[in-house]
Amino acid sequence: MSHYSMIDTYFSLDEDETETYLYLCRDLLKNKGEFQCTRDAFKFLSDYACLSAANQMELLFRVGRLDLIRRIFGQTWTPDSCPRYYMPICSPFRCLMALVNDFLSDKEVEEMYFLCAPRLESHLEPGSKKSFLRLASLLEDLELLGGDKLTFLRHLLTTIGRADLVKNLQV
């Protein structure tokens, strides 16, 4: 993975896409300490060659930036077009959380934060942006959410009236 492609990706993604990209990379960034900004996280991924070109194409595909795949790598990419020996970098759980994030409105995310307030009280930073992926990360840290722990999320989605998304969690 060249530094150029990481730099190009960093400058091309908007704030929400960057959050999704880094959430999908969370397993790679875990136990590496806290990054002061997203630029530091991208620098870490670039400096330590955590992502191959195929991995970065998968992440951009999951974020929905097919235009960047074509511009940076000069080709198209789909999960079916990768070789059989290629292991996906995004766990099914992280892909599912990114999918749920795409279908929630800001109002629904606010409702979820309100419902989780007693549990998150000491973990929330005042004035920080509230997003579903941030909430999912906090719930993972509190061990209330994980690949095998979706009950709490099902309850939250049912409470805010999003039974349609609960059906996606059955996978």
Swiss-Prot record:
Keyword Repeat part of the UniProt annotation: yes
GO biological process: regulation of apoptotic process; symbiont-mediated perturbation of host apoptosis
Alphabetically ordered keywords of this record: Apoptosis, Host-virus interaction, Inhibition of host apoptosis by viral FLIP-like protein, Modulation of host cell apoptosis by virus, Repeat
Gene3D superfamilies for the chain: Death Domain, Fas
Record's keyword annotation contains Nucleotidyltransferase: no
Ranges for domain DED: 1-74, 92-171
InterPro entries reported for this sequence: DEATH-like_dom_sf, DED_dom
SUPFAM superfamilies associated with the record: DEATH domain
Lineage: superkingdom: Viruses
UniProt cross-references to PANTHER family, sorted A to Z: CASPASE 10 (PTHR48169:SF7), DED DOMAIN-CONTAINING PROTEIN (PTHR48169)
Oligomer and partners: Associates with the death-inducing signaling complex (DISC) formed by TNFRSF6, FADD and caspase-8. Interacts with FADD.
Chain's role: Inhibits TNFRSF1A, TNFRSF6, TNFRSF10 and TNFRSF12 induced apoptosis. May interfere with caspase-8 recruitment and activation at the death-inducing signaling complex (DISC). May lead to higher virus production and contribute to virus persistence and oncogenicity.
Name of the protein in question: Viral CASP8 and FADD-like apoptosis regulator
Lineage summary: Viruses, Duplodnaviria, Heunggongvirae, Peploviricota, Herviviricetes
